[in-house]
Amino acid sequence: MKHILCFGDSNTWGYSPQDGSRFPPNVRWTGTLQKTLGADYNIIEEGLNGRTTFINEEGEDARPFRSGSDVFSMILESHRPLDLVTIMLGSNDLKLEYDLSVEEIAKGAKTLCEMVINSEYLVEHPPAILLISPTHFNPEIIEDEIEIFGDASQKSHQFAEHYQKVAEELGIHFLDAAKHVTPSQGEGIHWDADQHIKFGKVLAQKATEILL
């Protein structure tokens, strides 16, 4: 059996742009990935709303453990052995309060990839790594999100360029999610159900190519 760890944020968790609820397992892209690949594969979901590459939230309403780099080593140990690790983070790093460039965010993503490469828990069976650049924000994101993200739409279009460079530097696999998925037109950041299903099928094909 092949074990695939999917590490990400709310679009891996399955956040519905309609009402903020969680899509059921058979709708989330990870569920579609499992269904498409079949019983010979074990898909491990590790999505968390608000997760970043390396920054924790601050303030009275801050949610704990949002920094991916703070928890990733533990997660890798918990789910070993692994054959493939997918990493799709960076959208939450675009929040105005963090004031980060996409290049800085890509460095955060690179650190996560290096944590897999250098993990003492994966030495005997090093997994392949797939770095996924996040989708583009819709320019007309809802008002509540504009207060948090500002004009992050332009920055989000830079993800693929910088993430691909990281993948090339580290000799790992790369996928641009924006070539396959678009966020909800009504909300602008999260994916509708049909996009989850579409992306799950894309990932199934990519994972098969990597693990052949």
Task: State where each predicted segment sits.
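Acidic, polar ligand-binding/catalytic clefts
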Residues: 62
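Serine-esterase "nucleophile elbow" of acetyl-processing enzymes
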Residues: 1-49, 54-59, 74-79, 85, ...
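Alpha-helical cap/lid subdomain in secreted, periplasmic
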Residues: 65-212
